[in-house]
Amino acid sequence: MGKIIGIDLGTTNSCVAIMDGTTPRVLENAEGDRTTPSIIAYTQDGETLVGQPAKRQAVTNPQNTLFAIKRLIGRRFQDEEVQRDVSIMPFKIIAADNGDAWVEVKGQKMAPPQISAEVLKKMKKTAEDYLGEPVTEAVITVPAYFNDAQRQATKDAGRIAGLEVKRIINEPTAAALAYGLDKGTGNRTIAVYDLGGGTFDISIIEIDEVDGEKTFEVLATNGDTHLGGEDFDSRLINYLVEEFKKDQGIDLRNDPLAMQRLKEAAEKAKIELSSAQQTDVNLPYITADATGPKHMNIKVTRAKLESLVEDLVNRSIEPLKVALQDAGLSVSDIDDVILVGGQTRMPMVQKKVAEFFGKEPRKDVNPDEAVAIGAAVQGGVLTGDVKDVLLLDVTPLSLGIETMGGVMTTLIAKNTTIPTKHSQVFSTAEDNQSAVTIHVLQGERKRAADNKSLGQFNLDGINPAPRGMPQIEVTFDIDADGILHVSAKDKNSGKEQKITIKASSGLNEDEIQKMVRDAEANAEADRKFEELVQTRNQGDHLLHSTRKQVEEAGDKLPADDKTAIESALTALETALKGEDKASIEAKMQELAQVSQKLMEIAQQQHAQQQTAGADASANNAKDDDVVDAEFEEVKDKK
């Protein structure tokens, strides 16, 4: 069995890890970094850049550089959170035909799973380069508070990237695995506070050890899938824009290039303010008007940043209370607090969390790498490389169906351990009703319309009977990935209807297959491009070395040969400017054929140089027989 890699597919950064024996190892990417920016860029010449190369060119290509795509995955265009992003993102967010939030790049509509697949492909390639073998299986993490549609979309992204997603696990649970694996014995209850680039989760997890086997049981989870570092950046960007407008009278929001520069500067300033009390946002030539170029130079103190984002930090505290309440615990029952996600490096966040739990969070967990390490550990559990570890996760939101009067009837309550299965018998609302519609919902509200619709299906062929008589058994089955399968059965006729919830939104099978084929075609195009570049380099080298040999041969090269070589050199030079690998190879072959005489002359010259070198060495050897005498200076006595 091959390796199952662990991938933390983050909003801002992603990370990949593997099990090296029984030890998890975070892998460095091609740029030598342990984390990769979750940024994808589509350049003017049709190239797709991922990670640091994409980030570097963002300033000059803001409309075609996509970031924070995880905030759109599995979401509807009309969602309030998506509408907030539409107004602030430099790229174009659009409504797909099915109402999902998609992105338009260079006139082409793209689904978030398709874009996220580019990041996953880079993670896959990083692992393959390290292992020296193909990788086809992965454990991918998602925020604990992701709903069914978002989990399904993440699995789709894995498939498009050429990965079989063996398990979807929750980020805080993965972090707990990374933390708890090498810690001492005994039972502990931990709180994992995960504030990443775009999402926030809190999970209360109990780690029990019985006879050497560790059980990681999630007691409760809560969160906000639209709260993270990107929101903190936005607050600082808005402040800088307003300050500049006050000072210069120019609104930078109308200038995408300036906004992209400002985004980078704001992120940098936010990071600096975690260790410094103040920083300068200094952006020369940020824009220009009729009077000339304008420069931005604004001082930002840590206190100012904290005042801008205080409500965001406070927003993360309410879910902590709910999670503890759901787990039936109080603050004093928590043994350790673990911080995950880059935004937890902010001192204010650490202070608020410490105040809430009444204890300092642990500092021995790397907030950027813990989730990927935990995913790799789960991969090791699935392959059998990691033994004596049992993971019991929960479903984050209640699941149920719409019943008479537009009410949501819950079948599986939130924080139920998964996998799980639950059945309930319902009946008809009208006399002689021959069909029922099962409308599947996810959420905590009583009114069906206020919850997330996961999809609906019909059960036909019910035998005519008075209302309330037919018995329709509805079964909800949640697998270990947290993905829901629903069936409805008429107990009288035995008729049954089943669906795996693929949200009324989401990608259908044909779309996924098309994207998989596109990704494979792109991989083939990438391979051909790589081969073309290698051939070009060989051609360049041959061009340079042949010209040098012609120069060195001088008059020894017959005029006819020289003319033929010059002609072949020109032909190769022209071919190198094109995109045809076969043409370059043919011109290289022609040059090699007409350069026979030149090669002979070069070999003769080389042989002569070697002979001359040997003679010089022999003379030096003779000189070696001379004994050096030591002289002492004797001064005449005056």
UniProtKB/Swiss-Prot annotation:
Residues modified to Phosphothreonine: 199
Tree of life domain: Bacteria
UniProt cross-references to InterPro entries, sorted A to Z: ATPase_NBD, Chaperone_DnaK, Heat_shock_70_CS, HSP70_C_sf, HSP70_peptide-bd_sf, Hsp_70_fam
Modified residues (N6-acetyllysine): 109, 245, 304, 421, 556
Stretches for region Disordered: 602-638
Annotated SUPFAM superfamilies: Actin-like ATPase domain, Heat shock protein 70kD (HSP70), C-terminal subdomain, Heat shock protein 70kD (HSP70), peptide-binding domain
Induction profile: By stress conditions e.g. heat shock.
Gene Ontology MF terms in the entry: ATP binding; ATP-dependent protein folding chaperone; unfolded protein binding
UniProt keywords, alphabetically: Acetylation, ATP-binding, Chaperone, Nucleotide-binding, Phosphoprotein, Stress response
Bias kind Low complexity: ranges: 602-620
Keyword Chaperone: yes
HAMAP family assigned: DnaK (MF_00332)
Record-linked PANTHER family: HEAT SHOCK PROTEIN 70KDA
Family statement: Belongs to the heat shock protein 70 family.
Role: Acts as a chaperone.
NCBIfam families: PRK00290.1, PRK05183.1, prok_dnaK
Protein name: Chaperone protein DnaK
Taxonomic source organism: Escherichia coli O9:H4 (strain HS)
Gene: dnaK
